């Protein structure tokens, strides 16, 4: 009986995927790729132009942006590269 109960608990944990965390890229502009673990369920990539040229910011979540700033949000690991 204990074995059956333990088996059910393990199967439940595996099926629910408890503890899953999303990973998003967080490098800026043309820097080498870096990844961070996120509590949010999405990643973002913001783009805008300034006197240096096109700027890119990546991270976790899906923030609000000002007019003139491009925003792409996505929901799979490292989808914002």
Curated annotation (Swiss-Prot):
UniProt keyword annotations, A-Z: Acetylcholine receptor inhibiting toxin, Disulfide bond, Ion channel impairing toxin, Neurotoxin, Postsynaptic neurotoxin, Secreted, Signal, Toxin
Organ and tissue specificity: Expressed by the venom gland.
Superkingdom of the source species: Eukaryota
SS bonds (residue pairs): 24-43, 38-60, 62-73, 74-79
Keyword Secreted part of the UniProt annotation: yes
Any one GO cellular component localisation term in the record: extracellular region
GO molecular function, one term: toxin activity
Positions of transmembrane segments: none
Location relative to the cell: Secreted
Leader sequence residues: 1-21
Family: Belongs to the three-finger toxin family. Short-chain subfamily. Type I alpha-neurotoxin sub-subfamily.
Function: Binds to muscle nicotinic acetylcholine receptor (nAChR) and inhibit acetylcholine from binding to the receptor, thereby impairing neuromuscular transmission.
Protein name: Short neurotoxin 2
Organism: Cryptophis nigrescens
């Amino acid at each position: 009986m204990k074995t059956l109960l333990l088996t059910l608990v393990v199967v439940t944990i595996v099926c629910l995927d408890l503890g899953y965390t999303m990973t998003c890229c967080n490098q800026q502009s043309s820097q080498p790729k870096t990844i961070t673990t996120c509590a949010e369920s999405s990643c973002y990539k913001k783009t805008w132009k300034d006197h240096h040229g096109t700027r890119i910011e990546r991270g976790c979540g899906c923030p609000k942006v000002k007019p003139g700033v491009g925003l792409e949000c996505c929901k799979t690991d490292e989808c914002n590269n």
